[in-house]
A protein has these predicted regions:
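Alpha/beta enzyme core
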Residues: 1-75, 79-99, 106-109, 115-116, ...
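Extended, intrinsically disordered, low-complexity segments
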Residues: 102-155
Length: 155
């Protein structure tokens, strides 16, 4: 019913409805295959199936669905998940691959290092090489357009 609701609400033909299945850890491979087949039959444009435990399960899902709908792979840094490169994921038949949390984890580690340096030395001078410059930070965050809006709508 949720897929039908999404299809009924879709106004843009390019809007992609991705069916997500997290049942592997709880119910196992057979249930995942049944659920994903139901999603495909219900009209899902893409499948995002969390497969974490083994290459056999990953290959089974890919084999079953890669020719039916595009598959999405969520690349997890978890030690529970086989460490696959984007090329390996593509070779299995997945069409999209998301490295969803790696940059946040790297940023958190750098924040810890910077804050430890500040705590120990009272300055950030020892970690300046790990930081981007102010101009780059402003550009990344498109601060010039925000400044333009501030000036346009200032009271």
């Amino acid at each position: 019913k949720k897929l039908q609701a999404a299809q009924d609400a879709r106004e843009d033909k390019d809007f992609v409805i991705i069916a997500r299945c997290y049942a592997m850890l709880v119910n196992g491979l057979d249930d995942v295959l049944d659920r994903c087949n139901a999603y495909v039959e219900a009209g899902a444009d893409m499948l995002f199936c969390e497969v974490r435990e083994s290459m056999d399960e990953i290959e089974a899902v890919a084999r079953e669905f890669k020719d039916k709908v595009p598959l999405h792979w969520n690349h997890s840094p978890s030690p529970m998940v086989p460490r696959l490169s984007a090329k390996q994921v593509e070779a299995l038949g997945f069409k999209t691959c998301c490295f969803y949390i790696q940059s946040l984890m790297a940023a958190a580690k750098t924040m810890q290092e910077v804050l430890a340096e500040i705590r120990e030395s009272g300055t950030s001078e020892g970690v300046v090489d790990r930081m981007i410059g102010f101009d780059e930070l402003w550009e990344i965050n498109d601060m010039s357009s925000i400044r333009d809006m501030e000036q346009k709508y200032a009271v």
